[in-house]
Amino acid sequence: MRKLKMMLCVMMLPLVVVGCTSKQSVSQCVKPRLPPAWIMQPPPDFTWQTPLNGIISPSERG
């Protein structure tokens, strides 16, 4: 049993050493795309249209 543990330790040691000394690959930071132009425009002004309270009214209770 002791021989098996020693053999595992000897086999794992190079993997540990290589893993600790190798450089980690880091992906480049991707810049986000610009938003579409219609998002950047101010919202339209709908105050000139008929207000909804003139079109929709609560029904009478009866």
Curated annotation (Swiss-Prot):
Lipidation positions, renumbered (N-palmitoyl cysteine): 20
Membrane topology reported for the UniProt record: Lipid-anchor
S-diacylglycerol cysteine: lipidated positions: 20
Record region (Proline-rich): 32-44
Record InterPro entries: O-spanin (IPR010346)
Domain of life: Viruses
Main subcellular location of this protein, as a coarse class: host cell
GO biological process: viral release from host cell by cytolysis
A single cellular component GO annotation: host cell plasma membrane
Chain ranges on the Periplasmic side, renumbered to this chain: 20-62
Signal peptide per UniProt: 1-19
Family label: Belongs to the Lambdavirus o-spanin family.
Domain notes: The proline-rich region is an essential fusion motif involved in host membrane fusion leading to lysis.
Name of this chain's protein: Spanin, outer lipoprotein subunit
Gene field: Rz1
